[in-house]
Amino acid sequence: MKQFERIYENLDLIIFRADYIEGRSVEVAVSLQDYYYLIQHVDKEGKVENELDHIPIRISKAKKFREFLKEMKLLEWPTLRLGDKGYHDAPLVFSYGYDEEAEEGIDEAIPRNAIPSETMRRIHKELENLIGTTFGSYRFYDE
């Protein structure tokens, strides 16, 4: 398998899941390389409730968000890899490459208990600033 350098400049896809109401969640996926985002609303059974559109984001905002992740030291946090227990329940996944030979993304997940809830709240807020819209609920960070 081809090796990809795990550095901030290679960060591409950021997937953030925020809880919403009545067991629903909202997932925001942002591409820092292709400069777009999409939002999907997920019901209690895990089914996507809306059409997915790739919405462009400003290059300058994507660069600013990448710097924010660097300041937060994202790559120093404990992570899970695909196949690890809890990977699919993690609220934050980041990708830093795509292996065309293996046809898979090179990504890691930040488990819910790996960082303080205030840090997750801050990432949520910065993502809202990046995409220019609100999503999910902050109340779940206080529980």
Give, region by region, the residue ranges found by the protein language model.
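Short, cysteine-centered beta-strand-loop-beta hairpins and adjacent loop/turn segments enriched
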Residues: 45-47, 101-102
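Short, internal acidic amphipathic alpha-helical interface segments
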Residues: 56-93
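Short, exposed beta-strand/loop patches in secreted or surface proteins that constitute
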Residues: 28-30, 55-57, 94-96
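Amphipathic, interaction-prone secondary-structure segments
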Residues: 22-32
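N-terminal glycine/threonine-rich, aromatic-flanked beta-hairpin/loop signature
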Residues: 35-43
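Negatively charged, low-complexity tracts enriched in Asp/Glu with abundant Ser/Thr
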Residues: 1-8, 12, 48-64
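Short, solvent-exposed coil/turn segments at beta-strand boundaries
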Residues: 30-36, 98-100
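Short, well-ordered, aromatic-rich surface patches in folded extracellular/luminal domains
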Residues: 1-20, 81-143
